[in-house]
Amino acid sequence: MENRWQVMIVWQVDRMRIRTWHSLVKHHMYVSKKARGWFYRPHYASRHPRVSSEVHIPLGDATLVVTTYWGLHTGEKDWQLGHGVSIEWRQRRYRTQVEPDLADHLIHLHYFDCFSDSAIRKAILGQIVSPRCEYQAGHNQVGSLQYLALKVLVTSKRSRPPLPSVTELAEDRWNKPQKTRGHRENPTMNGH
């Protein structure tokens, strides 16, 4: 019998990102109660030796499963000590993998308050707009002009601790170009 391989997308992440993700998920499941219905499975409850945890997030009749791994092959850099995360959408027998931005958007649609459809009309009429958007990570890219106007109109209240973002968990912060603050040009290279 031949070996059969199954390929999945696993985002390489830093071990500290995974620890932060676990603590945020547990806080919002057990303390703030904003993540009602979420299910956390620790490493010892999994039969797979490389799975360090699973978070099952119900989305209607589907489920989003965020699985973190350890003991994978190391990456190109020393800090990539074989830790990774995969994000899977499950509905009955159908399964597919999703990107972190889409996962955040789906979580936002099902769990956290955002501006209602009538908020734009209320803002134009000068009425009080509520609720405010709690989960900023669910709005990927720039957002619509109406959303940006509402965001300016209604001051957002920062939640402590922040809500768990799958995009931030899978973000590659080492390969991004660094931003330099306050230096418009190099003073030694401007010809003077």
From Swiss-Prot:
Counteracts the innate antiviral activity of host APOBEC3F and APOBEC3G by promoting their ubiquitination and degradation. Acts as a substrate recognition component of an E3 ubiquitin-protein ligase complex: mechanistically, Vif hijacks a host cullin-5-RING E3 ubiquitin-protein ligase complex (ECS complex) and the transcription coactivator CBFB/CBF-beta to form an active E3 ubiquitin-protein ligase complex that targets APOBEC3G and APOBEC3F for polyubiquitination, leading to their degradation by the proteasome. It comes from the Viruses. This is Virion infectivity factor. It comes from Human immunodeficiency virus type 1 group M subtype G (isolate SE6165) (HIV-1). Disulfide bonds: none annotated. Induction: Expressed late during infection in a Rev-dependent manner. Keywords: AIDS, Host cell membrane, Host cytoplasm, Host membrane, Host-virus interaction, Membrane, Metal-binding, Phosphoprotein, RNA-binding, Ubl conjugation, Ubl conjugation pathway, Virion, Zinc. A motif (BC-box-like motif) lies at residues 144-153.
